[in-house]
UniProtKB/Swiss-Prot annotation:
Similarity comment: family membership: Belongs to the ATPase alpha/beta chains family.
Any one GO molecular-function label of the UniProt entry: ATP binding
Membrane topology: Peripheral membrane protein
Protein's UniProt name: ATP synthase subunit alpha 1
Compartments it resides in: Cell inner membrane
Species per Swiss-Prot/TrEMBL record: Hahella chejuensis (strain KCTC 2396)
Source taxonomy: Bacteria, Pseudomonadati, Pseudomonadota, Gammaproteobacteria, Oceanospirillales
Assembly and oligomerization: F-type ATPases have 2 components, CF(1) - the catalytic core - and CF(0) - the membrane proton channel. CF(1) has five subunits: alpha(3), beta(3), gamma(1), delta(1), epsilon(1). CF(0) has three main subunits: a(1), b(2) and c(9-12). The alpha and beta chains form an alternating ring which encloses part of the gamma chain. CF(1) is attached to CF(0) by a central stalk formed by the gamma and epsilon chains, while a peripheral stalk is formed by the delta and b chains.
């Protein structure tokens, strides 16, 4: 029995000696930092001399952070996920990887945070391509001219402030004037248009995110839309990263040849979160206490929006950033920055909103610098005449407020301008197809609606929507359109 046990021990000893003889030590040097202080979503760490900007950090309690500031003695990090109790003295380790997320078609219809974690109660994503949140912008040689229209379904925008695929169009105005409604209307109108949508909510109340998701579900738009949410209760670091997460996902799909519509709601909140982080990290403040590089941050974000050349797949990324003004002051720092970065702006005016004009868009102060090049020739031809009529009406309307007498020609301009204003009014989430858009524009320019009372205009528009001949298209000759509309509007019981 003892001999058997002894031989068994010898064999085990031989195996151990054989394993040791083939062992070669591998020296790994791992940096270890120490948490010095933490508070308000910002952590200061001592050590980690090789840490890089925007590198992820693992904290001892399981929390996740990102390097956001490098000093001689300390590393400043923003907290992205706080899973335990962060206290001074805990260890911090580098991950040697930047922040990113998994991009996959299964993200359509989902609600995620900027790190890719699900917020809708469904299972996390385990497949897809890894995309860096700080993805490079497309090079000049990879881009193409904006040449395709992106219809929003809003009559005033599609006619007078057209948007093209690959354009950056700012929506700006005071709170409560319908900025989100315009963006949502544009998203809802992309149904069956082979356009994917990403809606980023930054610093909004949690109820706002729920309302947006319910609106998308109610209209069947959640099937082609992804929500990226960093609400007001999220750490400022997540609020800062939210638009970059949406942009990285949109750029990935654009590189695959897809058309993507991106909504940033809103970049004023994003600028405030960046200001908060910068002040907490002791960066020198600039105008209105914003950091000096806030312009370049927004420029880097919005430069992702473009139309790729056919050699690069022909995809596009259209951006609709939203900005908030105070008392209609568009000369403030962030609004002027965004106006100078984007390709045009849709300006909402409180006086128009109070007068019952919906959407409350000030056509005179709104502009689309490149959208007209993508507008269909038929719609563009009608819009030129309409813009002239409307601008003349706005000039003459001022004199009517003082009781000035007008000659018959001016009275005609005023009457047709009032008619056009009624035609441009639109209920929330009411949408017009491009063919219906062309129909009412021709009807106005041909004077087919001049004899209708202003109170009957909504009914006339409803007749155009419901009775429009399906055989009519944007390529149909204008004479055929005019004949069909004359027959429709004269026989309709409006």
């Amino acid at each position: 029995m003892q001999d058997h046990a002894s031989s068994k021990d010898d064999r085990a000893l031989q195996r151990t000696r054989h394993w040791i003889s083939g062992y070669s030590p591998d020296v790994r040097i791992q940096e270890r930092g120490v948490l010095v202080s933490v508070g308000d979503g910002v952590a200061w760490i001592k050590g980690l001399p090789s840490a890089r900007m925007e590198e992820l950090l693992d904290f001892e309690d399981g929390s996740l952070g990102m390097v956001f500031d490098l000093c001689e003695e300390l590393v400043g990090a923003v907290i992205l996920q706080q899973t335990g109790s962060l206290t001074a003295g805990q260890e911090v380790h580098r991950t040697r990887r930047p922040l990113g997320l998994l991009a996959h078609d299964s993200l359509l219809g989902r609600v995620i945070d900027p790190t890719g974690r699900p917020l809708d109660g469904q299972s996390p994503l385990h497949e897809g391509a890894w995309v860096n949140l700080n993805s490079p912008t497309p090079a000049i040689v990879e881009r193409d001219f904006v040449h395709e229209p992106l219809y929003t379904g809003i009559r005033m925008i599609d006619a007078m402030i057209p948007i093209g695929r690959g354009q950056r169009q700012l929506i700006i105005g005071d709170e409560g004037l319908g900025r989100t409604s315009i963006a949502l209307n544009a998203v809802l109108h992309q149904k069956d248009k082979d356009v994917r949508c990403i809606y980023v909510l930054i610093g909004q109340k949690r109820g706002a995110a729920v309302n947006v998701m319910q609106t998308l579900q109610r209209h069947g738009a959640d099937a082609y839309t992804t929500l990226v949410v960093a609400d007001a209760g999220s750490p400022p670091g997540l609020q800062y990263l939210a638009p970059f997460a949406g942009s990285a996902l949109a750029s990935h799909w654009m590189r695959q040849g897809r058309h993507v519509l991106m909504v940033y709601d809103d970049l004023s909140s994003h600028a405030r979160s960046y200001r908060e982080l910068s002040l907490l990290l002791r960066r020198p403040p600039g105008r209105e206490a914003y950091p000096g590089d806030v312009f370049s941050v927004h420029a880097r974000l919005l430069e992702q929006a473009t139309c790729l050349s056919p050699e690069q797949g022909g995809g596009s990324l259209t951006a609709l950033p939203i900005a908030e003004t105070q008392q209609g002051e568009i000369a403030a720092y962030i609004p002027t920055n965004l106006i100078s970065i984007t390709d045009g702006q849709i300006y909402l005016e409180r006086s128009l909103f109070a007068a019952g004009v919906r959407p409350a868009i000030d056509v005179g102060r709104s502009v689309s610098r490149i959208g007209g090049k993508a507008q269909h020739p038929a719609i563009k031809h009608e819009a030129i005449r309409m813009k002239l009529d409307y601008s003349r009406f706005l000039e003459l309307e001022i004199f009517t407020r003082f009781g000035a007498k007008l000659d018959p020609g001016m009275q005609t301009v005023i009457k047709r301008g009032q008619l056009l204003r009624e035609l441009l009014k639109q209920d929330r989430f009411e949408r017009f197809s491009p063919e219906q858009e062309l129909a009412w524009m021709i009807a106005y320019n041909e004077g087919l609606l001049d004899e209708h009372p202003l109170t009957d205009i909504p009914a006339a528009l409803l007749q155009i929507q419901s009775r429009l001949d399906a055989r009519l298209s944007l390529e149909t000759p204008r004479e055929d359109w005019t004949a069909a509309l004359q027959k429709m509007l004269t026989t309709a019981d409006v």
